[in-house]
Amino acid sequence: MKNLILAIESSCDDSSIAIIDKNTLECKFHKKISQELDHSIYGGVVPELAARLHSEALPKILKQCKEHFKNLCAIAVTNEPGLSVSLLSGISMAKTLASALNLPLIPINHLKGHIYSLFLEEKISLDMGILLVSGGHTMVLYLKDDANLELLASTNDDSFGESFDKVAKMMNLGYPGGVIIENLAKNAKLKNISFNIPLKHSKELAYSFSGLKNAVRLEILKHENLSDEIKAEIAYAFENTACDHIMDKLEKIFNLYKFKNFGVVGGASANLHLRSRLQNLCQKYNANLKLAPLKFCSDNALMIARAAVDAYKKKEFVSIEEDILSPKNKNFSRI
């Protein structure tokens, strides 16, 4: 019975393929190969290197799931937003598969995929607020009961996750910075460094992490010897202030929208300090908090496959001749 959808994710530095049953939502296959170690020596993702590693990793993963090919009914792939050369790796493979197996091709927006990480094994819920925090994006969304997405707030410059990477780089801590900063912050003892919360007195529903990042840079310059103890104090102060900033604007949004349900997605949503703060906020406003599983917060093909199930039902297919690659976020107005 042809009821399986194969999905490919390659928007940045994770090569991933997943296969899902469109009827039961059962995951039949999921594999991800991360490039973090390859990029860590450069302090960030190098697009050309990412593309080459995708071209090596994706075929290796594909060989492991060939037994399911006979039951495939569609091929899905992340087509936006992301690094052009990385996206192209996945799209090229998806088009080749769709052509060879004579199957429909489904393009999936990467950010929609993150939203679907909340609903990997269940029907999607509408009428809820969503915080999306990742290395490339920081936004608060309202998923309306008609499936339309309304953008309530976004960042004016750096994203939440990106700011962690940059602060880690300032202190020569390595890449990716999120987990490194989070773990280092736990070692802070004095907690005598503090930073101002960005846009604290602004009524604008927006985020900005560039000023906080600069404040960290200036704090680092104060210390001739940046000891492990001082690094921990800076990491703690930065993480706490970055989360304060997220919560400050969210509180204003909660007062306006009275959410009954609120979801949190994206790679940076794995930060446990942020999760704890969000739980407290939702308890305060009697909202049900829904968190993506830690395993599926970062980029993965299973969330793309899950999004593709609903897209398949709506017959959102494209021709393999169509140019579907877009580094920017184009198709993100509704689920």
Curated annotation (Swiss-Prot):
Highest taxon of source: Bacteria
GO molecular function: iron ion binding; N(6)-L-threonylcarbamoyladenine synthase activity
PROSITE patterns given in the database record: GLYCOPROTEASE
GO terms for biological process, alphabetical: tRNA threonylcarbamoyladenosine modification
Record keywords, A-Z: Acyltransferase, Cytoplasm, Iron, Metal-binding, Transferase, tRNA processing
Pfam families, per database record: TsaD
EC number of this enzyme: 2.3.1.234
A GO CC term attached to the entry: cytoplasm
InterPro entries in UniProt: ATPase_NBD (IPR043129), Gcp-like_dom (IPR000905), KAE1/TsaD (IPR017861), Peptidase_M22_CS (IPR017860), TsaD (IPR022450)
Keyword Iron: yes
Co-factor note (free text): Binds 1 Fe(2+) ion per subunit.
Binding site for substrate: L132, V133, S134, G135, G136, D165, G178, N271
Catalytic activity: L-threonylcarbamoyladenylate + adenosine(37) in tRNA = N(6)-L-threonylcarbamoyladenosine(37) in tRNA + AMP + H(+)
Residues that hold Fe cation according to the record: H110, H114, D299
Cofactor(s), names only, from the UniProt record: Fe(2+)
Localization: Cytoplasm
Function of the protein: Required for the formation of a threonylcarbamoyl group on adenosine at position 37 (t(6)A37) in tRNAs that read codons beginning with adenine. Is involved in the transfer of the threonylcarbamoyl moiety of threonylcarbamoyl-AMP (TC-AMP) to the N6 group of A37, together with TsaE and TsaB. TsaD likely plays a direct catalytic role in this reaction.
Membership in a protein family: Belongs to the KAE1 / TsaD family.
Designated name of the protein: tRNA N6-adenosine threonylcarbamoyltransferase
Origin species: Campylobacter jejuni subsp. jejuni serotype O:6 (strain 81116 / NCTC 11828)
Lineage: Bacteria, Pseudomonadati, Campylobacterota, Epsilonproteobacteria, Campylobacterales
